[in-house]
């Protein structure tokens, strides 16, 4: 039924929250701001790292030191983005099986494109060919705009009709809608199932290998 899968990264393929939270907490401590818990940080993930930092400090982007704070946060995260990050249980088995079935795959994330490429090379080298991160400076709007998904489909030589989008959040559901793709939401990510059930989706899956039943 589908020959292409577009994956979100954080909360879908990789459990990155501990490393993201550590970088947020580093910046908060360095500048004397209240320090958020991991669960508090988790609620703010999904719209890219800049918006995450906006939500994590007093005054957000209106803070006169915001650019410096964001630069320090980004540098710290880039250096420590793989300390505790890991693929969710069953993800590598799923990706390998999809590869075996000649399913085309891409990662589309609002995370900085350098971090996305780095994590793709560490965890999915030789398995996933296309990985796109936030690059609005190049005129490509971040999710939930359809731009990144359309770019990924173009690179893969795929069509919307034969492609499915897999993610774990409100942003992912809306991205799929905007891109004209069916959406599969995963319950092991950064949003609880009761939140996911209020969104637009084709199916919610609880284990990675359940995706195989959907794409057949």
Predicted segments with their positions:
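Short, glycine/polar-rich helix-capping loops at beta-to-alpha or helix-loop-helix junctions
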Residues: 189-198
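N-terminal helical cap/lid subdomain that shapes the substrate entry/recognition surface
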Residues: 2-93, 100-101, 114
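Short acidic-hydrophobic, aromatic-tinged amphipathic segments that line or gate anion-handling sites
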Residues: 203-207
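Substrate-recognition "cap/lid" segment bordering the active-site pocket of phosphatases
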Residues: 83-84, 113-164, 170-179, 193
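Phosphate- and divalent-cation-binding pockets in alpha/beta enzyme and binding domains
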Residues: 23, 52, 90, 115-118, ...
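Short secondary-structure boundary segments
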Residues: 110, 135, 187-189, 208
